Amino acid sequence: MKEKKEIFTLLHQDAASPARTGVLELPHGKVLTPAFMPVGTAATVKAMTKDDLDEIGFEIILANTYHLFLRPGIEVIKAAGGLHGFSDWKKNFLTDSGGFQVFSLSQLRKITEEGVKFQSHIDGSRQFLSPEIAVELQTGFNSDIQMQLDICSSFGISKTQTLADLKITMNWLDRAFAAWHNTPHEYDGALFPIVQGGFFEDLRLQSLEAILKHEPRGIAIGGLSIGEPKDLYQEYLSFTAKHIPKNKPLYVMGIGTPDYILEAVKNGVDIFDCVLPSRNARNGNLFTHEGAISIKRKEYEFDFNPIDSQCKCKVCRQYTRAYLRHLFRTKEILYSMLATYHNLAFLYSMVQDIREAIQNDSFNDYYKNFLKKYENRLD
């Protein structure tokens, strides 16, 4: 059995909202919260070196179990000493269970209580993923935080189908914790369960009740930002978050735009991840304090200003919008490197500012002032 322990320390609670600062104590170092985690699908954040991530200041990144399980495979990563030895990223890794990719990428998948059978999107080979295998893989990766295998119910499905999904997820929850408790003694990564239940309050509470019996070190909220209207995201984020014990670090999966991050922090969320900041950067969409801009637009052809005059990242200190537009249009590799660096540095700096506002009991003012400028732009 793994020891019961708390990995989260509350540093400050905002005076007028659930927003809070804290610190996560993980095997590969501390993580100040709130914290955004860049997504490194194949143990690398696309177009970024580990030194880039370190230079910006990130203390934790995410890697995808599904992709790493299929290629290069668990044996290669274990032989390298886990993800840290394989990638030379010395700080923390959070890994997902692989379930979301199985359901979104794979063809001919079949879900049963035992697990999910699926075909690889790479070569069509038949594969099987269960709660126990997900824990075994992530333990082999030496993940600092690993996630429970779950079913993320699609937006818009019936309550009957959502309940059927939830029953399987709760079965997998029990099996995941049984497997985690049997991992080697020297492995000290945390297992985070995931609150599901779709857009039904009673099912969300049923999911959380099952989770709390396991006294987890942290809890994730899943099944949000999956295509629902923004007001529904806000409603169910707020509803779910307020029922989670305050001594647990709270992770909301799949959010990474400034407006969604602010809404999460406003509800007491501590960590969040999303592929969009880096993917959008590669596709020409860049964050600024005045809203996102599309660098491919002709209006930037003679614009010799930085991406964002308020941003202190090295890209904004050295390069202009006109130059970045040129790199994008000529499909230069350097474009993806510079654009990704900027978007991730922008979010990191924003979250630093959020932490400072919380410490000063002025989060609500920061929230309103940021969104007033950010949402006022249509590009």
From Swiss-Prot:
This is Queuine tRNA-ribosyltransferase. Zn(2+) binds at residues 311, 313, 316, 342. Gene3D superfamilies: Queuine tRNA-ribosyltransferase-like. The active site is at residues 96, 273. Pfam families: TGT. Keywords: Glycosyltransferase, Metal-binding, Queuosine biosynthesis, Transferase, tRNA processing, Zinc. HAMAP family: Q_tRNA_Tgt. Its cofactor is Zn(2+). It is an enzyme of class 2 (transferase). Pathway: tRNA modification; tRNA-queuosine biosynthesis. GO terms for molecular function: metal ion binding; tRNA-guanosine(34) queuine transglycosylase activity. It catalyses: 7-aminomethyl-7-carbaguanine + guanosine(34) in tRNA = 7-aminomethyl-7-carbaguanosine(34) in tRNA + guanine. The gene is tgt. Its EC number is 2.4.2.29. Homodimer. Within each dimer, one monomer is responsible for RNA recognition and catalysis, while the other monomer binds to the replacement base PreQ1.
